[in-house]
Regions:
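Conserved pre-catalytic core of RNA-dependent polymerases
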Residues: 1-132
Length: 133
């Protein structure tokens, strides 16, 4: 089921993402991005123009996505309600507890982060990252 959901969601996300966004996308790799950077630098030199790059390292990126913000983004980019509903159900009612050297905490609701290891997570992260830029 997740594979089907991912394929449908990816169709919409691909429409929203610019071509230069290569992370977690089929047929796009690091070498392509390095080549694009080299070409940009070369053209800037030819035209005697300055060029600036900004590289962002998203530390703990998958852990930081707020679910409520994600639902708003999905609505804003017009992801169909039936897909959004399936995603919301997937994330609904998640709870966790933390084990420390002093014992275990009580159970609490998880309101942030995408599911680790889930095939939907990179797609959801890309959409969120593009939205905040």
């Amino acid at each position: 089921m997740l594979k089907i959901l991912q394929a449908r969601l990816q169709q919409y996300v691909n429409y929203e993402l610019p071509d230069v966004q290569a992370g977690f996308r089929k047929g796009r790799g690091t070498r392509d991005q390095i080549s694009n950077i080299c070409w940009t630098i070369e053209k800037a030199r030819e035209l005697q123009k300055n060029v600036y790059f900004c590289f962002i390292d998203y530390a703990k990126a998958f852990d930081c996505l707020g679910h409520n913000k994600l639902w708003k983004i999905l609505k804003e980019v017009e992801i169909p309600d039936n897909l959004t509903c399936l995603l919301r159900n997937l994330y609904a009612g998640q709870e966790a507890t933390i084990r420390t050297e002093h014992g275990t905490t009580g159970w609490f609701q998880i309101g942030k982060g995408v599911l680790q290891g889930c095939i939907l997570s990179p797609c959801l992260f890309n959409l969120h990252a593009e939205y905040i830029m």
